[in-house]
């Protein structure tokens, strides 16, 4: 689906859920999340790669530790984590903490931005998979893959 339709679809599905947006580098993941953020009033970007420099009407926390933002969650509508693989700690424990936040803060929705990485599992036929795929395919509510086709961003719903 095209970007505009993808934004509408993802916004409808966010409703107190955890959504993953994954894709290759430069495939529009951060761009898509910023378009989604513009539809929300209180947004916190957790910039774990410490690269966000542009001005924004939203809040930005440059850290790779989820615990650093926990105290402000009751005031936030949307938490965008860019990039999930850069968070400190075990991915399974991180996703459990995010699920706990979703349970405790009923107006909170979470978007995880994730990179596709080389898959070194010899038993798998896929050469590349999203980071912590084994955890995220079970514990995210919806998953979207971004790509670039003919110079345009394309978003595909996986789950």
Protein language model features and the residues they cover:
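Short, well-ordered secondary-structure micro-motifs
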Residues: 55-56, 91, 121-125
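Conserved Walker B
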Residues: 49, 83-85, 116
